[in-house]
Amino acid sequence: MTNIIGKIFSITSFGSSHGKALGAVVDGCPANLELSEEDIQIELNKRRPGTSALTTSRQEGDKIEIVSGIFEGKTDGTPITGIVYNTNQKSKDYSNIKNTPRPGHGDFCWMERYGIYDYNGGGRGSGRITIGHVIGGAIAKKLLKTQGIEITSHVVQIGDIKAKNIDYENLEENIAKNNVKCGDLEAAELMEELILAKKEEGDSVGGIVETIATGVPAGLGEPVFGKLDGDLAQILMSINAVKGVEIGLGFESAKSSASEINDEFYYDENDDGTKSIKTKTNNSGGILGGMSNGMPIVSRIAVKPTPSISKIQNTIDLEKEENATIEISGRHDPCICPRVTAVAESATAIILADHMIRGGFIHPTNLKKSI
């Protein structure tokens, strides 16, 4: 089982949905980064359950506790361990799925590979394990901000409802105005109605989440097998329920001509008289040849509907070796996309932080030497 990602700035994720705790060990963060539990708590609150009618009713405070790696309010260059204790498990809700794998979940695959599976809340296969992503990502985001890099994720589609009028200039402000985390306020209302309708039906719905990273310098990435977009795709696919990743124009580029989508370069005059190299369009999503080109890095992930629904579904009984049906109880999100935004931001930050150190943009041991 692989629970580690990153070559220098690395994250080791641990814990399960109904276990005692979850968290992450962050290694490779340079010393002298100002960091507090509040910095991480802000990010955890973005993915915390039970915050609106659009999420699971499971009430968890998700309070972070840092147990290593901080000295006098700053990172000291040693591994940073962050822990979140589970407080509201209801394992009895899962007793009926011990031998009946849930359709759409990884239960069957875990049983086949390991021969044992913590079925309570999905165990290590639960979306709750993304707490580890967010702990690592919160630290990565704080590190990246010292270099002027900002990351924002937002919902651009729920079901067949698309955000068509996104105000990117006021994106974060508009995201904060609705529970869907969508930058198009009119579309957000329709999305919320759809999610609540699916919830009432005992069903769920999927969508698409877009992530934008600005301020990223040109030259991040290591071809051939260390491409920046390759590493981003890997960590984004590690997020539960993600079934597809695209960078920039993505799959739309397959039906276009090069003359239509090639990003043409130009020199842009800065206020101080210097020049910056930019592209007139950003169809490549800020990455060419596996390396950043200085434009915003744009990715989108396809998030499938939460497979835990209350409708009766067909499955099998592994103990009796016969066909069966299952009706899933418990507390589940009718749409996971609003909470995935926080995880997508964190996942992106982890990879960018790792590549910033690998590329020599951030000093590997002492942040003071980078600023």
Give the predicted meaning of each segment.
Residues M1-R58:
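N-terminal, positively charged regions that mediate nucleic acid binding
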Residues S10, S308-I371:
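Internal helix-turn-beta structural module
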Residues S10-S13, D118-I129, A218-E222, N282-L288, ...:
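A short glycine/serine-rich beta->alpha loop
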Residues S13-K20, G202-V205, V209-N323:
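Glycine-rich anion/phosphate-binding loop at the beta-strand->alpha-helix junction
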Residues K20-N32, R128-I149, G230-Q234, M295-I297, ...:
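Alpha-helical support elements that line or immediately flank enzyme active sites
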Residues L44-P103, D107:
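Glycine-rich, N-terminal phosphate-binding loop and its surrounding beta-alpha-beta segment
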Residues I97-G123, N314-H332:
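Short acidic, glycine/tyrosine-flanked loop/strand segments centered on an H-E-D-like triad
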Residues R113-V224:
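Glycine-rich, mobile lid/loop segments that gate access to catalytic sites or pores
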